[in-house]
């Protein structure tokens, strides 16, 4: 048995991650997708890497131009497929981390900074901050102040605050207008550590979030009531620190698990009935922080990604 395991390990080391078959290849659904985490890469529908960047990342998008917008702990970059940096913003002092990068409808870039002055920024193409307001994370724990903030079509901003157990909606001037609590008793209360990681406003007005240590994803109606949720009980324990999430055009939900390594299943797609319809255990996706599904069976996901 030991010799067989050694032989398998050596074989995998020789052929490399480029040719390791994935669970995703065994289903009728095929995706190309951007992974953001321990590795930063675009994986094709054939499960081969199409682009790999030099550093791990936290957040990002493939833009309509084909360039990739990326958030790192200390900076934001827009890079070409040739890895040329065409836009950048560096973390300001005295803050300690960056968590978000999103290209806004007006062409500027949304950035969030964590630290002694947690704030949401709008950055112009020349890297200058043209607008900002303070965030309300309710904690001095820098790393857990916030994650994937997003601008809404209304111009407001939806921001997940982990240790506040809350998703907060702010106006462009920083006024708090709505709060969705994630420490509800129906979700296990605060002991379940339902720390919100994503804050996704859906086309129907509901809000989707993934709840990290709570190992679940939840959809709230505009009043903050739970209308849909999926937990580890529904997926045979595949969730392990549910971080990134995306609602696809077909209504399915894709959810990533950050605490994964090697060939563990790190991303799954489920339908409304919570049936798993696609999985990825690609080595480049291990430790995924966030992701973006780009295509499904050759067809591009339309519009602004709901992620």
Model-derived features: positions:
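Sec/Tat signal peptide C-region and signal peptidase I cleavage site
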Residues: 20-24
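Positively charged n-region of N-terminal signal peptides that target proteins for export
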Residues: 1-5
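Bacterial N-terminal signal peptides
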Residues: 7-19
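Histidine-/acidic-rich catalytic cores in large beta-rich domains
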Residues: 25-307
């Amino acid at each position: 048995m030991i010799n067989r395991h050694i032989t398998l390990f050596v074989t995998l080391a020789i052929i490399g991650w480029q040719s390791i078959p994935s669970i995703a290849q065994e289903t009728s659904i095929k995706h190309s997708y951007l992974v953001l985490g321990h590795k930063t890469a675009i994986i094709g529908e054939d499960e081969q890497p199409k682009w790999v960047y030099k550093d791990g990342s936290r957040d990002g998008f493939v833009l309509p131009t084909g360039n990739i917008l990326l958030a790192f702990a200390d900076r934001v970059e827009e890079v070409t497929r040739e890895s040329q940096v065409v836009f950048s913003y560096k973390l300001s002092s005295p803050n300690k981390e960056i968590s978000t990068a999103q290209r806004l409808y007006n062409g500027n870039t949304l950035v969030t900074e964590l630290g002694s002055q947690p704030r949401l920024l709008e950055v112009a193409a020349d890297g200058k901050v043209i607008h900002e307001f303070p965030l309300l994370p309710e904690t001095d724990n820098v790393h857990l102040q916030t994650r994937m903030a997003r601008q809404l079509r209304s111009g407001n901003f939806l921001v997940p605050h982990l240790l506040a157990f809350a998703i907060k909606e702010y106006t462009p001037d920083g006024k708090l207008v709505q709060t969705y609590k994630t420490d509800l008793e129906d979700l296990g209360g605060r002991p379940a550590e339902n720390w919100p990681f994503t804050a996704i406003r859906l086309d129907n007005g509901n809000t989707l979030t993934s709840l990290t240590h709570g190992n679940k994803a939840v959809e709230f109606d505009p009043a903050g009531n739970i209308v849909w949720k999926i937990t580890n009980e529904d997926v045979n324990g595949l969730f392990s620190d549910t971080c990134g999430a995306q609602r696809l055009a077909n209504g399915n939900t894709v959810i990533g698990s950050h605490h994964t390594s090697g060939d563990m299943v790190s991303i799954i797609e489920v339908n409304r009935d919570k049936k798993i319809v696609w999985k990825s255990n690609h080595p480049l996706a291990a430790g995924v922080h966030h992701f973006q599904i780009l295509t499904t069976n050759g067809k591009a996901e339309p519009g602004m990604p709901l992620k």
